[in-house]
Each structure stands twice: as C-alpha cells, then as structure tokens.
C-alpha cells in the first residue's frame, strides 16, 4: 500500500521486495546493479539493527538470538506484578539499572489508598533491590528514559509497548512483564533474528507539519498489510538530517502502532547535541548503515509531501489528511460510523454527523500529552499558534501535559506556559492518563482530538456497559492548537500563518537530582517492602496436564482485538496489583459475560486440584466426559485438566500489559485460539503465563466450534514435549469432531514454561 496525494505524488511508497541501500542514500532494487562482492546475506549484516543485536546476543547463533539488555524500565501499572513474579522466582538484586516510574495512575482517586500503596511498594523495592524510583508527576516513563537512560548502541527493555528510543541510537522493545522478569533473573530474551525494514526519509516537512503527521502517514501505509509486523524499522536517508531530535522522537514513539518489533535511526550532530544538553555526552554514538546494506523491504517517505493528518476512531491506522476530511465530511464520517458498528458490536448508538456545524467539523476537546505529544518542541509550537487567541467559553476544552518536569520548567521560563494559559489552556503535570483513559474522559458522544498514542474504542475512558461512548482522533500538537485557536473547528496548522520561535531547550538536572531516588545500583537487603492491602501474590498455577478439556467462553470476530478489549485500561488498572481483583474486569467492555463463564468452568479445575470430582463441581461436564470416554476411556483422574479458552481472529494489538493474558490465566484459561496473533509480545505473554497459543487456518466465519463448545485435546502435554507443530483436538458434541490446532514456533524454554504452567513455576523448578 502507498499513500498518494492528488496529482499522483507520493507521501509514502512501499517497495514490494528487498532492497540494497548504498552509502545510506542510494536505493537499489536489482542486485545486479550493486557493484560489490557481498551476498544478500552478508549485506544484511550491515544494517544498524544487526550490529546492535549482535553485540547483545549471548548465543553463537545469529538466527536464534538470546539477548541481554542494558537497562529496564517499567511504570506503575506493571512494576508490581513484575517484581512480585521475580520475587517468587528467586530475585535477590536488580542485576542492571531498572527504572520504576509512576506516571499512569498518579492522578486516579479510585480504590482509596491503592495507587499510592503501589508507589510505596515501588520505592521500597528500588531501595531493597538497587533500582531507580521516579515519583509521580516528575516524568512519563519514556521521557525519563530518553533524558536519563538511552545511549548509542544500547538496548532497553520496557514493560510498555511504546518503549522506543531508536531516534537516540537505542534499540528499545516493549514486552509483557515476564520478559523483564527473565532479565531480572539473568536470563535472556529469546527471538529469531527479525527482519529489518528501511524507512527512507527524504525531503523536509512543511511549516505546520509535525512528527505525528509523519507517524500517522507511515502507520496508515503499513499497519493493515503487516509490512513491518514484528520487524525492526531502521530510519535512514537524507531526510533524517532535516529533522530535530524532538521531531524524530515524536515519529519514533509511534512506530509501535505499526506492530513493529523495534526501531533504530541513524544518528548525527543533532542527536549528539541532545546528549550534550542532558549532560550525557559520553552516551552519544554515531550510527549509520554500512556502505552496502540489504533490507527486507523499504518504506519511502517524502517528508515534503506529508500533510497534517488525522487518525479517525477507532484505530491509529484509520488515517486521512485533515484537508481530505474537511472536504468530504459527510462521506468520511459515515464510513467511520460503519466501521464503528464492528468495533462497538452495536452496544450503543454511534453517530458523528452532529459534529458538522455550518459545514465544518466541530470537536469538544483537544489534548497534547504523554510520550508522544508532551515534548518541548510540540508544546512550544502549540503556544506559538495559540498566542494572542483564546479557545472560547463554550464546550471546547484544551489541556496540555508536558512529558517531564524539566520540560515543564523550561516552558515556564520561556513564557510558553503563560501563552497557553492566557488562551484558556489547562496545563497539567507529567501523566499518561489521556493516553489510556485515566483522566480527561470526554462527555458522552463528545469528540476529542489528541496528540497521544492510541484511539482504540473506550480507551479514552467511556464505558460501553453503561451506555457511554466518546471518540478520540489522533492529530499533531500543531493542528490541535490550530483547532483550539479556531475554538474547536477542525483546522490544520498549515492553514494558519504562524511565526514559530524555535526556542532552544535547556535541561535542569537538579529537578531529578532533588526528587528521583537512584540507588546507583546498590541494593539494601535490610529494607522492608511496603505492601498495601490490595497487593496480592499470584495464585498457584497448575502444570499442563496430560489431557486438556477447554470450553470456548468467548468468541470475537473483529478483524483485530486489542489488549484494551482483553483487559480495559483506565481506572480498571488501579487494581493491577491484585491479580484476581483485576481479572474481574477481563473482556468487560467486549464480552461482559466472559468472566462469569470462565469462573463457572474453573470450578472443575479447582475440584481437580482439591482431589475432588470435576463432574460433581460442574454438572454440564457429564455428557461431555461420557462422549470422550467412548473413545478415550482412560482419561480422567490424574491426567485431565479443565479450563477455558477464547477465540479471536487476531488478538493482541496494542499494549504490552501482561494482564491481557494473566487475567485469563487466573480465571482458568489454558489457551487462546486465533487465526494469527497481532503482536509477538501478546503471544509471549500467553506463553509466559502457561497458555497454549493455538492457531487455526480455518476462516473465522466457518469455525468448527462456537462459543459454549468444549474442545478436547488428548495428549497435549506429549505434543508440546515432542515439539509437534500440529496438535489434534476434538470438538465435543454428538460425536468427536477432529480439528487441527497449530502451536507455531516455540523455543525449548517456551515449551518448558507451558509444560510447567507459567514462568514462576518454571523458575522454581530450575532453582
């Protein structure tokens, strides 16, 4: 797919095959035109990504990587579960720098003391195990990492999907918590060598075009076709030099929405200056691809042709130019409404036509926030646009969240905050809430434009089960400010004549020195961890049985199922430290009956674990077991497990939160069945929680099973042990109907984790 403008000019063009890049600038498709003795395989070793992965690979096989990261980072939705898992698995000390930020629930007043209890847990763990603790309001996770952690040629693993520091020369990856646990226990991150896709930047952005515009254009061209799925995006080309460090960072953080694995950029003097400004000159490293580098594909981005963009509800890939939307309002809004019928399952009435006022599109809210929008240059540009204007005294509201206190301080000093506030803007502290529904939830049926990372259904905080719906569209800070200056009528920043001051950034290191706890890697075993009453240990989990019987308790036919749908974000996340408490919200917005169904089936497994009869605990099992015993009379006590599974076409897009899998697990989930998995990280989460990542080739519209059916998987343990690619299973009805379930590629360690029942059991067994 390519994105074209009227007149045939390309904003984005995708190459159908692999390409060679000569001297970082010349694109060559035909190997015969490459004047070099290098083979394709040798030239592939000249990518920046290959070099960094090689330096961090602890195995002798570059096709099967075993990666050790330099640093780790987590926020307060995930660090409690990670540390609790690591503690249960033998943690004694953080073996590498591990930063714990508190940027997700620091403003939530849900559940009394539970949020601050988690923060105190984090602080005492940082002291006990030798970590870094960033208090609430000081910085969002990724801005702190950019300012204080990133380094040229380094690798960072974070328990947040937007862990991306490629613009600074750092390969960063976002994964579920169990992958961080492995690093904390001196184990490795095991993956196949990923493909590498060149993102070739050419030209220079027009005045008023920002990083989110470029990012959305790339996402729109690559998400649906999976062009960069689970691959590394490597940014090259002459256009890189025409972008500031902040601009590059703003594009880079959004690469997650393409479903890529990681990103890396060539670096130059502008990145050196970034490190100099932050007092870390020694962490800069010049990075460039080799003279002849081979890539598995190439995305050509003509920066000069990028226009102000908007990602309409309910996905970052649902992109249009703002001019295109304004010129075709009724048609595009109707198309969005039709797509929403699928996303929302008809749970509420959804219409955008009432947003058209006097032929213009009116929005009720604008927000610039978080790791994507809250950067210094974004907010300075917004202040330049709105200076001397005002947002009006009607429905429209405008909020800005600087991504860190050092940024906030500099914006105060240079007058940008005053310009914003005078215009009616509300300026708040560093907080991720607008990105995931923990603050600034719009009114019912309201429309919000945001420079944040995602606009999935209900991610802004509305509750379908209460009959609520509001919408978020993603835009760049500049066009959001232009819309604010126009009192809520959608306006691209290029439509305004603005003098951008281009103010220089100064970093005040004393802000963090005064407030951030840094152990400098020194652990203090004498410190007692503070446990609030909501912080619970993980429940015991059984090993994979010889034979497995699972009931399908949810069936989702959307093209993609997000992790937000599997476990909602927002205020729900306050219960993140209580596995069973959080699980009560699993699939609550997508399939409210899921939890009840799963818990009902779980009664049988609990009976088995108590050495009681599962049929007595769950009467509906009797005819199911009778049918199984006709063919498999030996199946029963001591060799059978009973639980639940869900089917989804393509689950796992979005967040790295492990809770999308662990909540299913603690409710008795043994497996997922999918046509494919949206991301590597969600599949890894399933595996690390001992769940079978089954796949079926059968189209979702003609499945051999349905919600409520039981599926019997005989000798499943043997199949995993013997590395079977296809597992025989049976849908239990009037007869046993045979089906094939694929397991996909699994490492030996992943197989053992599944056999042991979860990562915690695996490490306990290997002590």
Regions found by a protein language model. Name each.
Residues 2-767:
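Fe-S-dependent hydro-lyases/dehydratases of central metabolism
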């Amino acid at each position: 797919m390519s994105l074209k403008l009227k007149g045939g000019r390309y904003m984005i063009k995708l190459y159908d095959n692999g390409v060679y890049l000569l001297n970082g600038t010349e694109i060559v498709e035909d190997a015969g035109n490459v004047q070099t003795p290098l083979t394709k395989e040798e030239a592939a070793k000249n990518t920046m990504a290959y070099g960094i992965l090689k330096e961090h690979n602890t195995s002798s096989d570059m096709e099967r990587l075993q990666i050790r990261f330099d640093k780790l980072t987590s926020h307060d939705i995930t660090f409690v579960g990670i540390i609790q898992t690591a503690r249960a698995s033998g943690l004694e000390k953080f073996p590498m720098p591990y930063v714990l930020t508190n940027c997700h629930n620091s403003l939530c007043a849900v559940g009394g003391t539970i949020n601050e209890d988690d923060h105190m847990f984090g602080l005492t763990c940082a002291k006990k195990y030798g970590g870094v603790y960033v208090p609430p309001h000081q910085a969002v996770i990724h801005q702190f990492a950019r300012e204080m952690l990133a380094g040229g040629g380094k690798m960072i693993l974070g328990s947040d999907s937007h862990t991306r520091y490629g613009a600074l020369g750092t390969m960063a990856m976002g994964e579920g918590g169990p992958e961080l646990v492995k690093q904390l226990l001196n184990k490795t991150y095991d993956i196949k060598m990923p493909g590498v896709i060149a993102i070739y930047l050419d030209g220079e952005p027009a005045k008023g075009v920002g990083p989110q515009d470029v990012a959305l254009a790339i996402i729109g061209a690559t998400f649906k076709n999976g062009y960069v799925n689970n691959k590394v995006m490597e940014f090259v080309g002459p256009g890189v030099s025409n972008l500031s460090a902040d601009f590059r960072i703003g594009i880079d953080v959004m690469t997650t929405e393409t479903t890529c694995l990681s990103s890396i950029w060539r670096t130059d003097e502008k990145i050196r200056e970034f490190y100099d400004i932050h007092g870390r000159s020694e962490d800069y490293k010049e990075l460039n691809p080799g003279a002849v580098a081979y890539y598995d594909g190439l995305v050509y981005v003509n920066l000069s042709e990028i226009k102000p963009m908007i990602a309409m509800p309910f996905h970052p890939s649902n992109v249009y130019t703002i001019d295109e939307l304004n010129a075709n309002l009724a048609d595009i809004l109707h198309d969005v409404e039709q797509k929403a019928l699928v996303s929302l399952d008809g749970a509420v009435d959804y219409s955008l036509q009432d947003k058209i006022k006097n032929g213009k599109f009116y929005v009720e809210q604008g927000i610039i926030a978080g790791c994507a929008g809250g950067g210094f240059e974004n907010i300075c540009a917004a202040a330049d646009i709105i200076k001397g204007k005002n947002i009006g005294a009607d429905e429209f509201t405008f909020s800005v969240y600087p991504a860190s206190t050092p940024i906030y301080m500099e914006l105060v000093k240079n007058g940008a905050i005053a310009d914003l506030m005078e215009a009616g803007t509300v300026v708040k502290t560093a907080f991720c809430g607008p990105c995931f529904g923990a603050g600034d939830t719009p009114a019912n049926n309201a429309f919000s434009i945001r420079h944040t990372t995602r606009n999935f259904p209900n991610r802004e905080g509305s509750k379908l089960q209460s009959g609520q719906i509001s919408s978020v569209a993603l835009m760049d800070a500049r066009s959001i400010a232009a819309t604010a200056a126009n009192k809520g009528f959608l306006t691209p920043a290029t439509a305004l004549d603005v003098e951008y001051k281009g103010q220089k950034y100064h970093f005040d290191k004393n802000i963090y020195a005064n407030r951030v706890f840094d152990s400098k890697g020194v652990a203090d075993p004498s410190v007692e961890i503070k446990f609030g009453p909501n912080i619970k240990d993980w429940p015991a989990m059984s090993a994979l049985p010889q034979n497995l019987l699972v009931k399908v308790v949810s069936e989702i036919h959307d093209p993609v199922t997000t992790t937000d749908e599997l476990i909602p974000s927002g205020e729900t996340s306050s219960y993140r430290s209580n596995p069973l408490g959080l699980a009560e919200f699993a699939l609550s917005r997508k399939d409210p009956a899921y939890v009840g169904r799963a818990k009902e089936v779980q009664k049988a497994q609990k009976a088995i674990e108590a050495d009681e009869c599962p049929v007595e605990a769950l009467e509906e099992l009797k005819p199911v077991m009778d049918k199984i015993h006709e063919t498999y009379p030996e199946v029963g006590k001591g060799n059978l497990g009973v639980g639940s599974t869900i089917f989804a076409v393509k689950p796992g897009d979005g967040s790295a939160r492990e809770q999308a899998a662990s909540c299913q697990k603690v409710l008795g989930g043994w497996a997922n069945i999918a046509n494919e998995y949206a991301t590597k990280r969600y599949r890894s989460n399933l595996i690390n929680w001992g769940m079978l990542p089954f796949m079926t080739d059968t189209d979702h519209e003609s499945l051999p099973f349905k919600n409520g059916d039981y599926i019997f998987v005989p000798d499943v343990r043997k199949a995993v042990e013997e590395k079977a690619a296809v597992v025989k299973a049976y849908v239990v009805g009037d007869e046993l109907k045979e089906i094939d379930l694929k397991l996909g590629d699994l490492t030996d360690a992943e197989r053992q984790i599944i056999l042991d029942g979860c990562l915690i059991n695996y490490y306990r067994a290997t002590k």
